[in-house]
């Protein structure tokens, strides 16, 4: 039976993708002005990020999960809607001086060419006005950013968490990054190592943004190391906004140089297994959400075929190797 978007998002949330830990929420708050009159969170969940602001601050939010939106409505001085923030502008003719967000990473969205509802397609088109292209349909990361910038006032500040892949992936996302860097949108990008979500620890990026600026340089931050990078260098790197491309490169190089090759190989294998486990969990949720996708068993059978192929080659007498041969 087809499951709802609510059930799908709950599955992802159970992976630790949506609840922002208090320490990280306060780190995000530190990038915003000290005195805030109002704040908007376009993917507010149960209102965790909105709760870090005082009762005197007007709070606005949208959340696709009705039950979570109901929890957020208990926040003093708040106006919360339940719905899809990328499909409907719930605060029409309003822009905000302060926006804070931790949108879900890497989820699909219905961009204008795929949105059957004319009004929803109109809003999705508006948030990408003047952009060179839309965010890809299978990944809404930059659609959330476009929405945030669309709702940000001319002198406002926004801070948002983002998965690292969005900083370097190519094609449409690279074109969007080029456009936004050219507008001077990003003032600061920080790598948050091992961000502690509910039941997982992942690296994320924290983006501090403005509507636009003549200053196209970006401050890249990794822990205590930071460096301001000019537009020309970012352009030379194909508008790759990965923090480690610009700061801490020598430290990273030394780290790998001194690492025991056997330990390195074991670490890589563990990372592959961890990533595969998370990918399968997400793929299963996608299959439950959209019955048009091929069954998860087909994917698992394909993985098993790859494993069997390598097991067979290793057991062949002609392919017996020593440990040294593998490393």
Region annotations inferred by a language model:
Residues 93, 97-327:
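A conserved structural/catalytic subdomain of Rossmann-like adenosyl-cofactor enzymes
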